[in-house]
Regions:
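Surface loop/turn motifs at the tips and blade-to-blade linkers of beta-strand repeat domains
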Residues: 36-43, 80-84, 132-141, 178-183, ...
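Beta-strand-rich domains and repeat architectures in extracellular enzymes and scaffolds
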Residues: 38-64
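Short, aromatic-rich amphipathic segments at membrane interfaces
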Residues: 298-326
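Internal/C-terminal transmembrane anchor helices
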Residues: 354-376
């Protein structure tokens, strides 16, 4: 009786260990092939921004992953796209509480926009809610949400309407319309200063304006006066408006105080970097951050720090090591039960059965060795091929965007 009870306890313990192991593997499945001792390399950066604590938020992997990087340059967490969260994030900001807000765009039929929304994540990257949703017109390929600015406990987002630009504050639950003429057809991106209630916008024909109540908006920058200039994303912070210039491959800096309005200067990177990469986006609140297809650039005045990868935080390293250990235990347990079963079959059945089992065992062993040897290479090739195709797609989209801007410039 005591021997039987001992077996039952062993069975219960093994069952609990199996359930715990399966839970750990399922919870960490997205980190299964991440080496905890190597830096996490960006695959295709779409956007980056900073917060007041020095942390950086990066949209990576073709808009499907959000990364939070600590002030000392370590990866804290990663949130992945899903039907229960976001599908394709195009902008990211963090409020004073550490909550993260995403501009989520849902695409259908290749390039047509089905809907847009503002998705709220917790400071740990967990989905909380969708705080705003905008249905797109059928067949539309242009975004209606054209900017986001973080607040202490929420976010302000700008949305194109027939009447102009609708500025909504989720913290206060308020909204206001700025009557910009032909906003839906003209405006590419907006920035907003909450302190002065000022709206800035860049148009498809390469001009940057500040909204005025007079109906004649103030022209701050005209790309027609600068050969090759194509201003793209804009962002405002502390009296200065910044714009990513995808034509000249630098950052336009426009002081917006009374004394310096209309003057501009530029933040530029080394020529070798200009030849390889373009800073498509810039975000000023918190920390001035720009991003290229491959990297993130943190600015400090004229100086900058560029990085393509980040080491994992200590917590993530421990979690990954635990995940690998659990996987090793599961593999060992499966092999143990397989060997035990094989021994039982060998003892119980005939020589023919023994021979068959031996052959099957050899085949399984060879297959396991083959898969274990070639799978990492196959995974690497698959990732590289997917990455190359995505880069080609992004490059094609950017070229199309540039052509559209140029054509719009001619039209206006």
């Amino acid at each position: 009786m005591e021997h039987k009870r001992k077996k039952q306890w062993i069975l219960i313990i093994m069952l609990l260990l199996t359930v715990c192991s399966v839970f750990v593997v399922y919870a960490g499945r997205e980190w299964m092939f991440t080496n905890p001792f190597k830096p996490y390399t960006f695959s295709s950066v779409s956007y980056a921004s900073g917060d007041g604590d020095g942390c950086t938020y990066v949209i990576d992997d073709s808009n499907r992953k959000i990364l939070k990087i600590s002030a000392d340059g370590r990866l804290l967490w990663r949130a992945c796209a899903s039907d229960k969260s976001f599908l394709s994030a195009e902008r990211v900001v963090a409020d004073g509480d550490g909550n993260v807000y995403l501009h989520d765009v849902r695409i259908e039929q290749g390039v047509q926009i089905a809907s847009e929304g503002i998705v709220k994540l917790s400071s740990k990257g967990k989905y909380i809610s969708t705080v705003a949703s905008v249905e797109a017109e059928k067949g539309s390929v242009r975004r209606n949400i054209v900017g986001m600015v973080p607040t202490e406990h929420g976010v302000v987002y700008m949305q194109k309407e027939k009447e102009g630009i609708l500025v909504s504050n989720t913290e206060q639950g308020s909204s206001k319309v700025f009557s910009v003429a032909d906003a839906q057809d003209r405006i590419l991106c907006c920035a907003y200063d909450r302190d002065s209630d000022s709206l800035f916008y860049v148009t498809y024909d390469g001009k940057i304006y500040k909204y005025t109540d007079s109906g004649q908006d103030e022209l701050l920058y005209d790309s027609d006066t600068v050969d090759g200039s194509i201003p793209q994303e804009i962002s405002y912070s502390d009296g200065v408006l910044y714009s990513a210039d995808i034509g000249l491959r630098d950052i336009i800096r426009i002081p917006c105080d009374m004394e310096n309005t209309g003057s501009t200067d530029r933040l530029t990177v080394e020529e070798s970097l200009k030849e390889r990469e373009i800073a498509y986006h810039v975000s000023a609140p918190g920390t001035l951050v720009s991003s290229t297809n491959y990297s993130v650039i943190l600015w400090d005045g004229e100086d900058y720090e560029q990085f393509w990868d980040v080491p994992l935080s200590g917590k993530l390293q421990v979690w990954n090591c635990l995940l690998w250990a659990v996987c090793a235990v599961i593999v060992a347990a499966v092999l143990f039960f397989a060997v035990t079963l094989l021994k039982i079959l060998v003892k119980k059945f005939s020589f023919y059965a023994k021979t068959t089992m031996a052959v099957i065992g050899i085949i399984v062993g060879v297959a396991a060795l083959f898969i274990g040897t070639l799978f990492p290479q196959f995974q690497s090739l698959l990732v590289d091929e997917t990455y190359k195709r995505e880069i080609c797609r992004i490059s094609s989209n950017k070229q199309t965007s540039c052509r559209c801007i140029s054509e719009a410039g001619k039209a206006f």
